[in-house]
């Protein structure tokens, strides 16, 4: 029997094993902090139960926490007579939420105090707070440079070689997303279409779509702020469409350029005479190896204003140049990278690609300087250590806290 504490990490099947790879990164950092790690597979309930029982026997009262991504496993037991599994076992469950709460909304609002949600950007956290109004804990933890346990390295581009610029992104024809809208009631079609018009009228960059949905609904006389079902339906539909539309714009701009695009769903594009290569998606561990060989990685943010996608953090973590779309947060925090950034109206992505191609050496120098700065400021490893601190606080106040004064006891009733 071990006298060490253990952390459970919950995983399952995801596209290209992205969550599986992130879970291995969590485990790497947690082990350096002195905790053992046990993996649970939510897709195999028999294996899940056996490993959990064995772990509880091996670590009696020393399972420090369970961690998952995207709400995996947070709802286990919610609808059973015994109640939520983590509450029953007194194991704090922390889930790192990567998507807008409008997607899989139940994963963002658990009925049990054992579950705590961690958001990597404030936009999603604030939507959760303002509209889902969760009864239990949430927190904000930004990622930081993702080194994947490797040392970042400065690129040394050769003048005789075309620099490797990649765009790892799956897409789909945005027009096909609008087809099902045609059978909806005319009022819903109006709100969907006017939300899109409002979004492009208000922003040329990222930005949440919820304000555009509200503006379109208000103009139609429909109040959505107290109608979470309709509100999140519109947000999910518009958010998905806008993101796919942006991928389409980027991919079309890249076709004449010497870029490698890794992803599914772009076979509808006419690649006749294209210089860009559209390649099949690869598993995440292979993608990390490609990151190490690249001079620049093209990214596209989610529709957010106050953080970036994890892809620029991967670029900075390996020492190469992130080429991403601009939002106010990016503009404020990465002014030296603005010449290599783009939006969807005035700053064409082809200009950023051309800048990399015209002067790879300067690109490499700027990327390396920014990589060093980011790795000193914040990394994914630092985020995981902060996560462990949050878990200890969450565990204490959920399962161990005894109010020292009568006033606090009354507040807790």
Specify the residue positions occupied by each region the protein language model found:
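Active-site proximal beta-strand in glycosyltransferases
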Residues: 86-99, 116-120, 143
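Short acidic, S/G/P-rich loop/turn micro-motifs used as interaction or catalytic elements
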Residues: 13-18, 44-45, 71-76, 100-101, ...
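A conserved, positively charged/aromatic
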Residues: 87, 105-120, 130-133
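Nucleotide-sugar donor-binding catalytic core of glycosyltransferases
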Residues: 11-22, 134-305, 326-330
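Nucleotide-activated donor-dependent transferases that construct or modify glycoconjugates
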Residues: 1-15
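Catalytic binding pocket for nucleotide-activated donors in carbohydrate/polymer assembly enzymes
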Residues: 8-11, 21-33, 37-45, 110-111, ...
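Short N-terminal targeting/anchoring amphipathic segment
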Residues: 57-75
């Amino acid at each position: 029997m071990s006298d060490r504490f253990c952390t459970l990490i919950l995983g399952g099947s995801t596209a290209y094993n992205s969550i599986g790879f992130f879970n291995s990164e969590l485990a790497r950092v947690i082990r350096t902090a002195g905790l053992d790690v046990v993996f649970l597979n939510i897709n195999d309930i028999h294996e899940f139960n056996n490993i959990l029982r064995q772990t509880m026997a091996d670590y009696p009262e020393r399972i420090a926490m369970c961690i998952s991504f995207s709400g995996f496993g947070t709802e286990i037991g919610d609808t059973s007579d015994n109640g939520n599994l983590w509450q029953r076992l007194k194991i704090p469950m922390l889930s790192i939420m990567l998507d807008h709460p409008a997607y899989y909304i139940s994963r963002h609002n658990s009925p049990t105090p054992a579950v705590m949600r961690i958001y990597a950007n404030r936009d999603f956290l604030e939507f959760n707070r303002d509209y889902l109004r969760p009864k239990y804990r949430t927190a904000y933890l930004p990622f930081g440079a993702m080194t994947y346990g490797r040392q970042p390295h400065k690129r040394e581009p050769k003048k005789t070689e075309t620099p490797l610029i990649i765009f790892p992104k799956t897409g789909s024809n945005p027009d096909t997303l609008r087809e099902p809208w045609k059978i909806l009631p005319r009022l819903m079609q109006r709100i969907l279409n006017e939300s899109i018009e409002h979004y492009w009228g208000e922003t040329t960059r990222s930005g949440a779509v919820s304000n555009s949905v509200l503006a379109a609904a208000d103009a139609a006389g429909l109040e959505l702020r107290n109608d979470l079902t309709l509100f999140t339906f519109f947000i999910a539909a518009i958010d998905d469409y806008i993101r796919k539309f942006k991928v389409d714009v980027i991919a079309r701009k890249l076709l004449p350029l010497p870029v490698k695009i890794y992803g599914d769903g772009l076979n509808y594009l006419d690649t006749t005479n294209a210089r860009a290569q559209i390649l099949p998606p690869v598993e995440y561990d292979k993608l990390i190896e490609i990151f190490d060989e690249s001079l620049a990685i093209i990214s596209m943010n989610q529709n957010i204003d106050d953080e970036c996608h994890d892809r620029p953090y991967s670029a900075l973590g390996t020492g190469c140049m992130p080429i991403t779309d601009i939002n106010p947060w990016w503009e404020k925090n990465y002014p030296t990278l603005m010449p290599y950034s783009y939006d969807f109206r005035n700053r064409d992505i082809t200009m950023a690609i051309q800048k990399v191609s015209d002067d790879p050496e300067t690109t490499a120098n700027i990327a390396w300087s920014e990589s060093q700065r980011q790795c000193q400021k914040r990394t994914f490893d630092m985020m995981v250590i902060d996560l462990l601190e949050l878990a200890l606080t969450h565990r204490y106040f959920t399962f161990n806290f005894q109010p020292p004064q009568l006033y606090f006891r009354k507040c807790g009733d």
